[in-house]
Amino acid sequence: MSDTSILAYCRPGYENDTANELTSRYGEAGFYGYPVSKKNSGFAHYHLYDAAQLEQTVTQFAVHDSIFPRQLVAVFAAINDVEKEDRVGQVLDALKEVEKPFSIFGAVDVEYPDTEEGKTLAKFCRKFTVPLRQALRKAGWLTAKENLGKPKLHIFFASFEICYIGFTLPSHASRDHLGICRLKFPSDSPSRSTLKLEDALVNMLSNKQQSKVLRSGGRAVDLGACPGGWTYQLVKRGMYVEAIDNGLIADSLMSTGLVEHHAADGFTYRPQFGRVDLLVCDMIEQPDRVAKLMGDWLVKHWATHAIFNIKLPMKRRYETVVEAMTSLNSRLDALDDAFAVKVRHLYHDRDEVTVTIVRTSKDEV
Ligand SMILES: C[S@@+](CC[C@H](N)C(=O)[O-])C[C@H]1O[C@@H](n2cnc3c(N)ncnc32)[C@H](O)[C@@H]1O
C-alpha cells in the first residue's frame, strides 16, 4: 500500500514533541501535511499531502539538524497486514508498486521502535534481514555489495503486523541502527552523566569542530560539575577545567592536577583567568535562565564555545526549547562572529536536550 510520510524515530514518551517539531519545520518550509503519533510508541509520522514532495524533503532536512528525531525516514510504502508466511514477498510486492525513488539502494536496515514492545521484534528483525537482503539483490533493488555512500532502504516494523518502507540519504541520516549510538560507560568516570557529554562531543561536533573546541592544554569551565562526569571528558582530552559546584568533586579528577574546584554559584561565577575555550553546563535549572546565562558568557567573550543541557518541562517541551533558543540565537546573531548551533535530544539524554555552540569568525563561514 502506498504511503507518503516522514517517519521519525524518537525516545518513547517524546512522540508528541517529535510530531510538533515535524509539523512546524516541514510546514514552515512549505511541505504541508499532518502529524500522527501515539504515546510511548517510539516514533511519529508526518504525512505529506503532496507525495511528489517526498524526495525534496529528504534532501532538505538532515536528522542532525533536528531536535527530537533520532532518524528521519522518507516512507513511500506501508504494509498493514504483514503475513508470517511470506514477509519477503510482501516487501517485494510493496516495492514493485512504487516508482523507484532511486535506481538502487546501497544497504538495507530492518528496524523496530526503541520500546519494550520493540525489543520483542529485535531478534526477528535481525534474522529477517538475511533472506530479505538476498531477495532485494536478486530483484535489483540492492547493490551486490554494501555501499554506504548510496541511499539506504529502511524496513521499519512498528509491530509484527505493520511495517513501513522508506529510505534515507547517507549525508542526511544517522548511520546508527535505530538512530541510536550506544556508548560504553568508562568505569573510571565519577558519574554516568559523562555519557551525555561524550555523546554530544562525538555525535554533534564534526572532527574539525572537535579539534577546535577540545584543544589539549585549552581551558574550560564546567558549571554544575559534581561529581565530575563532564569534567572527566574534558580532562581526558588534556583540558584545564574550573569545576563549579557546591557538591563534592571526585578525588581522581583533582589528582590529575588539571582541575580547580570552586564551591560557588554557577550563575554568578566568572572565569578566573580571562576567556576560556569552552563553557559546559549541566545545572538543573529553568531553560530560559540557562539560555540567558550561556548567552552572557558568549556575548561577553568569557567563553569561545559552549555545550550545555536544557532540562525539559513536562509539557510544551518542543515549544520551550524553541523559545529558549530563539532568544539566545537572536543575541548571537547581533555579534560579529558566526555560531554553529545544534540542539539534539541525544540517546543518553533523558528529560533534557543538548546544545552545542561553536564560534567561527564570519570570514571562516
Ligand atoms: C546533573 S548534576 C551534574 C552532573 C555532572 N555533569 C556530572 O557529569 O557528574 C547537576 C549539578 O548541578 C549543581 N548545581 C545546581 N545548581 C547550581 C548552581 N546554581 N551553581 C552551581 N552548581 C549548581 C548541582 O549541585 C549538581 O551537582
Swiss-Prot record:
Species of provenance: Alteromonas mediterranea (strain DSM 17117 / CIP 110805 / LMG 28347 / Deep ecotype)
InterPro entries: RlmM_FDX, RlmM_THUMP-like, RNA_MeTrfase_FtsJ_dom, rRNA_MeTrfase_M, SAM-dependent_MTases_sf
GO molecular function, one term: S-adenosylmethionine-dependent methyltransferase activity
Upper lineage: Bacteria, Pseudomonadati, Pseudomonadota, Gammaproteobacteria, Alteromonadales
Classification via NCBIfam families: PRK11760.1
SUPFAM superfamilies the UniProt entry points to: S-adenosyl-L-methionine-dependent methyltransferases
Cell compartments where the protein resides: Cytoplasm
Function: Catalyzes the 2'-O-methylation at nucleotide C2498 in 23S rRNA.
GO biological process, one term: methylation
Chief localization: cytoplasm
Pfam family, one: FtsJ
Binding site for S-adenosyl-L-methionine: S193, C226, P227, G228, G229, D245, D265, D282
Alphabetical UniProt keywords: Cytoplasm, Methyltransferase, rRNA processing, S-adenosyl-L-methionine, Transferase
Disulfide bonding pattern of the chain: none
Protein name per its UniProtKB record: Ribosomal RNA large subunit methyltransferase M
Residues forming the catalytic site: K311
Keyword Transferase: yes
Family statement drawn from the similarity comment of this UniProt entry: Belongs to the class I-like SAM-binding methyltransferase superfamily. RNA methyltransferase RlmE family. RlmM subfamily.
Enzyme Commission (EC) number: 2.1.1.186
One GO CC term on file: cytoplasm
